[in-house]
A protein has these predicted regions:
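Extracytoplasmic/periplasmic substrate-recognition and gating elements
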Residues: 237, 244-248, 284-311
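Extracytoplasmic "Venus flytrap"/periplasmic binding protein-like
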Residues: 58-126, 161-163, 262, 266-270
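Glycine-centered hinge/linker elements that transmit conformational signals in sensory
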Residues: 177-180, 221-252
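Short, low-complexity disordered leader/linker segments with a strong preference
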Residues: 1-43, 61
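Short, well-ordered beta-strand elements
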Residues: 37-50, 65-70, 94-95, 141
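A structural signal for short loop-to-beta-strand junctions that line the ligand-binding cleft
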Residues: 84, 92-94, 123-159, 190, ...
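Extracytoplasmic/periplasmic solute-binding protein
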Residues: 141-145, 150, 176-224, 231, ...
């Protein structure tokens, strides 16, 4: 299926239900209107989530529509290519997996397909948070693929070698103590890495109880104060201590081959991230199979975990 219009609307998600509804997500070359289902023989999907390979096969078997599934990179790597394709007026996919935070930026520019009328009743399939995250200005632009309650993933082989029981790490002070023991295994061993991800900062400050955002009563103004929030300071003090003492890898780029290699060989021994991570470990750090475990996130004071990351 070919498109000749300057821009085409993109539906953003990775869920199989959405794939079923984008049979009309292409553009009619004459009118620029969505093509009819009967015209569609192939759709292009950009996604990095490995389980979608089987979803695409099942979709083709069900509908007869071929799915050209491409992994063009994760996060900003994909978004850069997406932006370039949209600007060029060609090469953009029909469906793209993106994180929830990216939906508004594309919706504002008119790059997304409004699928509100195609998703009536779908909200019952999802919890309120993820469902609200695919909406902007009262319109639905995708279907949730997952949500990201935070979890503590760790390489048990490395933790055992360092004499650390990850299941007993309940506070950030205990995590700091574990970081020192793991780094003692060798100069290239780190309890985790710092990839400079702003989403990680948001999640960890949230976990520390931060509320640096204030909204006016009419919702027209938002004030952000990161310098005086107690939760922000709690996290930044903790994390800065790890950085100052060289206990965190700051040189390996997140989601790179070296990053996943570190998870396989144990030099990056744990991750604080969303509960969606297992599929990525299985796909990109397969040689580490059997070494990794997951447990509850430690918190500043050992209280209940209440944060999320990505999705």
């Amino acid at each position: 299926m070919k498109f000749t219009v300057a821009k085409k609307a993109i539906a953003l998600t990775g869920a199989v239900a959405m794939l079923g509804s984008v049979a009309a997500c292409g553009s009619d070359t004459a009118s620029g209107k969505p093509a009819q289902d009967k015209d569609v023989t192939e759709i292009t999907v950009w996604a990095w989530e490995p389980t979608l390979t089987q979803v695409a096969k099942d979709f083709t078997k069900k509908t007869g529509i071929k799915v050209d599934l491409k992994n063009v990179g994760t996060n900003t790597k994909e978004y850069t290519q997406l932006d370039n394709a949209i600007e060029a007026g060609s090469g953009a996919p029909d469906v793209a997996q993106v994180e929830y935070y990216a939906i508004p930026q594309y919706a504002i520019k008119g790059n997304l397909l409004d699928i509100t009328d195609k998703t009536s009743g779908y909200s019952d399939f999802y919890t309120p948070g993820p469902w609200a995250s695919v909406q902007f200005a009262g319109k639905v632009y995708g279907l949730p693929m997952d949500s990201g309650p935070m979890a503590f993933f760790y390489n048990k082989e490395v933790f055992d070698k360092a004499g650390v029981d990850a299941e007993q790490i309940k506070t950030w002070d205990q995590y700091y103590d574990a970081a020192k023991k793991i780094h003692a295994l060798g100069d290239n061993y780190y309890i985790t890495s710092d990839t400079g991800d702003a989403g990680f900062f948001d999640s960890m400050t949230w976990l520390a109880g931060a509320k640096p955002f204030q909204t006016s009563s009419d919702g027209s103004e938002v004030t952000v104060n990161l310098t005086e929030d107690k939760g922000v300071k709690t996290f930044t003090d903790f994390w800065q201590k790890l950085l100052d003492e060289g206990l965190v890898d700051t040189k390996t780029a997140g989601w790179s081959e070296d990053w996943f290699k570190g998870m396989v060989d144990g030099t990056i021994a744990s991750l604080f991230t969303g509960a969606w991570m297992p599929a990525n470990l299985a796909n990109s750090a397969a040689d580490g199979a059997g070494k990794w475990r997951v447990t509850q996130m430690p918190t500043a004071d050992g209280s209940t975990t209440n944060s999320e990351n990505g999705g």
